[in-house]
From Swiss-Prot:
Broad class of the protein's primary localization: cytoplasm
Cellular component per GO, a single term: cytoplasm
GO molecular function, one term: translation initiation factor activity
InterPro entries: DEAD/DEAH_box_helicase_dom, Helicase_ATP-bd, Helicase_C-like, P-loop_NTPase, RNA-helicase_DEAD-box_CS, RNA_helicase_DEAD_Q_motif
Keyword Ligase: no
Binding site for ATP: A67, Q68, S69, G70, T71, G72, K73, T74
PANTHER family: ATP-DEPENDENT RNA HELICASE DBP3
Protein name: ATP-dependent RNA helicase eIF4A
Function of the protein: ATP-dependent RNA helicase which is a subunit of the eIF4F complex involved in cap recognition and is required for mRNA binding to ribosome. In the current model of translation initiation, eIF4A unwinds RNA secondary structures in the 5'-UTR of mRNAs which is necessary to allow efficient binding of the small ribosomal subunit, and subsequent scanning for the initiator codon.
Ranges spanned by the short sequence motif Q motif, renumbered to the chain: 23-51
Amino acid sequence: MASEGITEIDSGLIETNYDNVVYTFDDLNLKPNIVRGIFGYGYESPSAIQQRAILPITEGRDVLAQAQSGTGKTATFTISALQRIDENEKSTQALILAPTRELALQIQNVITHIGLYLNVTVHASIGGTSMKDDIEAFKSGVQIVVGTPGRVFDMIERRFFKTDKVKMFILDEADEMLSSGFKEQIYNIFRLLPETTQVVLLSATMPQDVLEVTTKFMNNPVRILVKKDELTLEGIKQFYINVEQEDYKFDCLCDLYDSISVTQAVIFCNTRSKVEFLTTKLKGENFTVSAIHADLPQADRDTIMNEFRSGSSRILISTDLLARGIDVQQVSLVINYDLPANKENYIHRIGRGGRFGRKGVAINFVTDQDVGMMREIEKFYSTQIEEMPADIGALFN
């Protein structure tokens, strides 16, 4: 409960006001078919956030949970939601919101896999797709809805999505969801849910303003917060290259590729125009490149992501659209062609490179004007970004 105060466990790595830690899936009192789905999905034992968050969520408590990118946040609320769903009740019982269509689709995929042996229906209600499909899904009955705020609110307003049986409201990437761009939509949706609805927020970062906002619609939440100065990404080697000025970045990128052998890489830029510029330039140098940004039609985005996942494209250039939650297994290198404008997006970007302990390398292109921002990032995450060594190629052999 909020009034209990925060205690530290695990040598200060985690702050929490909830003492129960469960070290095996078998001890979480889950439906046997969920455990079967968990093992089938490839999990052997719960991650740190799963050990602490699944139990209070399945007990119906409001939960504010924070963990690093790639530590199993999605499975945390997936397992919990599947446990709480009444399989005999065909109405919507759980609503999960995500900031991007891609993340919503990935969450749907995880729910489908872990819930493989349950009689549970899940539907992604996202912008850029046919409204007719949404309407048909809601009319036929769907127990878990994963969606983006705009489309979900539209379906509720049009009365196709009936919220009277919703008992769980889950926000993934809460720092992004509660930023100014989504806050109003979230509030509008929340006001249309039953007063007894359980609220669960999960995110990699929890700035103070977000923590304050959560008090408006959470009831004595269990808080499980990774201390900020421990919020570096294990397994990710972080480097910077001082390119001095913007005009030198492209030549630096080509020189870098001459010295390393990389299976696949994600390159982040801050604007759509920069993504398009860099894509054109790299294709001119005969690189196999894909590009993705928010203005692309949904079908095109899906095709591009599938091509990259299958390995037919070696370089994916993206804006921060991709930075939250998209798990591309083979990525060993992330390049910040531009440092993120928002330092809280840094962890989401470089987290693409080494999820669940897989090693990765992040290289930041830094102009003279960027040095201050890089120092801010280092301070914010209590980390050190080292100058790229001359023998960088050895890290990829």
